[in-house]
């Protein structure tokens, strides 16, 4: 995989995203994220949580996931996306002033469309961008009067053999949380890849 210059941006092409065919060594830059904790006379090394990047555009979010794979940091990243889902922008024809007060978590149609968008569009596009297999399975659902949250977790081997994961010590899990509220159609997506 080629690395892009900081000034140069590559357009996201979901049909031509490169697959991650084999694992590599953990980047040396990650050693700065390891902290030592002393407790009861012993010292334990702990990896700090990955720094969070904020996005307001799905394409920028997916490009970040692709770039983290290119940079060999696919197993240590945290991204937060706040956006209006495509089915909302399509319904209001791109004019956000036309958003109806019923376009939120209280509407069964909104919840159904959002769930369809997550499972049929967002997650498959994230998988294409990452270059490895994502298997989030069934979602855990938390609902309160003010918000609805889908929680997904993937602790699979991501399409790599256990031998290859052990050889490079690359074991990681993925967490994906998608939240909507009862006030507007804004959707919050929190994606985290954490080494285990």
From Swiss-Prot:
Q: Where in the cell is it found?
A: Cell membrane
Write out the entry's keywords from A to Z.
Cell membrane, Membrane
What topology does it adopt in the membrane? Peripheral membrane protein
Record carries keyword Membrane: yes
The organism sits in which domain of life?
Answer: Eukaryota
Q: Which InterPro entries match?
A: RGI1, RGI1_sf
| GO cellular-component term (any) | plasma membrane
Q: Where is the composition biased (Low complexity)?
A: 29-45
Q: Name one GO biological process term.
A: energy reserve metabolic process
On whether Signal is a keyword of this UniProt record, the answer is no
Q: Region annotation Disordered: residue ranges?
A: 28-48
What role does it play?
Answer: Involved in the control of energetic metabolism and significantly contribute to cell fitness, especially under respiratory growth conditions.
Q: Which family does it belong to?
A: Belongs to the RGI1 family.
Supply the name of the protein: Respiratory growth induced protein 1
- Species name: Debaryomyces hansenii (strain ATCC 36239 / CBS 767 / BCRC 21394 / JCM 1990 / NBRC 0083 / IGC 2968)
Gene name of the record: RGI1
């Amino acid at each position: 995989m080629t690395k892009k210059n900081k000034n140069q941006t590559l357009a996201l092409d979901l049909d031509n995203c490169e697959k991650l065919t084999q694992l590599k060594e953990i980047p040396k830059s990650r050693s700065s994220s390891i902290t030592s904790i002393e407790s009861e006379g012993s010292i334990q090394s702990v990896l700090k949580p990955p720094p969070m990047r904020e996005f307001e555009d799905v394409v920028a979010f997916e490009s970040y996931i692709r770039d983290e794979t290119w940079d060999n940091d696919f197993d240590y990243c945290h991204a937060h996306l706040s956006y209006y889902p495509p089915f909302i922008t399509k319904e209001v024809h791109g004019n956000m002033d036309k958003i109806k007060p019923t376009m939120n978590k209280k509407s069964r149609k909104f919840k159904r469309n959002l769930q369809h968008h997550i499972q049929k569009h967002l997650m498959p596009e994230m998988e294409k961008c990452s270059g490895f297999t994502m298997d989030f399975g069934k979602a855990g659902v938390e609902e309160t009067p003010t918000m609805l949250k889908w929680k997904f977790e993937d602790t699979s081997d991501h399409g790599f053999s256990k031998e290859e994961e052990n050889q490079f010590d690359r074991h990681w899990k993925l967490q994906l949380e998608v939240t909507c509220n009862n006030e507007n159609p804004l959707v919050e997506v929190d994606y985290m890849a954490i080494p285990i």
